[in-house]
Amino acid sequence: MRKKIKVLIVEDSLVVRELLKHIIGSDERFEVMAAVTSAEDCLEMLETQQPDVISLDIRLPGMNGLDATLKIMSRRPTPIVVVAAQVDDNELNIAMNALRAGALSVVEKPVGVTNAGYDTMAAKICTQLAIMSQVQVVRQGINRGLNFGSDDTPARVSQGRPGTYSMVGIVASTGGPQALVQLLGGLGADFPLPILLVQHITSSFLEGFVTWLSGTTPFEARIAQDGEKPVAGKVYVAPVDHHLGLVNDQLVILDLPAVCNQKPSGTVLFGSMARDIGKHGIGVVLTGMGADGSEGLRQMADKGAYTIVEDASTCVVNGMPAAAAKLGAARETLPLPAIAARLRDLALGGEK
């Protein structure tokens, strides 16, 4: 018999706590090790017991979810899935910063069993807990998660012909927000190319994610609008439940079927870049589940674009990068801290 995944639930609301116990306890993969009401209780329990994964509320009495994440990752590193309500910008900001501090993913708080979205939401919570329980987390200094920058980023390796590349496309899923903060921070405010981004994220968190990205990186992040002409200094994020594409150097918002079970899809973005700018594009596949982006990246590579996938050593989940590499779509496979250096080199100097 397969060993069950031990889950520690940290949630102060009695209603939500009981609902999480029901959702997780009804899945035969899990064992609810305990359900506590505060971060302090969680930390005390971790002194003597080790869950496989923690379901962590953000808004708690006393210590909030961000501070709890920092302490957990410095004292007793454990995979953390943040469970957040989409109620206000402050809660979303805390949730996103918890990712920077070492939490692995954010999911939406469950709704009542009679709600139309209950089954989908419950399945997503269980999927995230199961996947994240397998991630090998490491001890982090108390401030490490809030200090992503370019310190670990190698210097540019060469200079060549400016103007070879005109645009960067990025796709990310699980682990993406924290990876993007590190990557974009390493690019610097003088990075000369527009950036188009597909981030798989719960729709109710998208606007908060975009605001958070603007506040934590040198770039202005915004939800892409149909007909916009991308310019340097901005990150154009695919909107909720629509694909993002590029036609005649302008953004297009497409209401087409999902690709690789994703809408928006990185493959749609990359495919449009391959057709529109060919060898002048750069495509990057970051951490994430599934295979989205792999076929589109192959199309970019076939057109002579520069294609990069994140190395497994720095991925939270190595699904999408591995799928792209398996297709032969990756010109380079790089650990996350090296990707920014390579992008700067390409944008400012051409090919290596």
From Swiss-Prot:
Q: Where is the Response regulatory domain?
A: 6-124
Q: Which GO terms describe its biological process?
A: chemotaxis
Per the UniProt entry, the Enzyme Commission number(s) are: 3.1.1.61, 3.5.1.44
4-aspartylphosphate, modified sites: 57
Keyword Hydrolase attributed: yes
Against InterPro entries, the record matches this protein to: CheB-like (IPR008248), CheB_C (IPR035909), CheY-like_superfamily (IPR011006), Sig_transdc_resp-reg_Me-estase (IPR000673), Sig_transdc_resp-reg_receiver (IPR001789)
- What's the PTM story here? Phosphorylated by CheA. Phosphorylation of the N-terminal regulatory domain activates the methylesterase activity.
Q: Which UniProt keywords apply?
A: Chemotaxis, Cytoplasm, Hydrolase, Phosphoprotein
Listed as disulfide-bonded, the cysteine pairs are: none
Q: Which reaction does it catalyse?
A: [protein]-L-glutamate 5-O-methyl ester + H2O = L-glutamyl-[protein] + methanol + H(+); L-glutaminyl-[protein] + H2O = L-glutamyl-[protein] + NH4(+)
Looking up SMART domains in the UniProt record yields: REC
Report the family membership: Belongs to the CheB family.
By its UniProt entry, which HAMAP family does this protein fall under? Answer: CheB_chemtxs
| Protein name (database record) | Protein-glutamate methylesterase/protein-glutamine glutaminase 2
Instruction: Show the taxonomic lineage.
Output: Bacteria, Pseudomonadati, Pseudomonadota, Alphaproteobacteria, Rhodospirillales
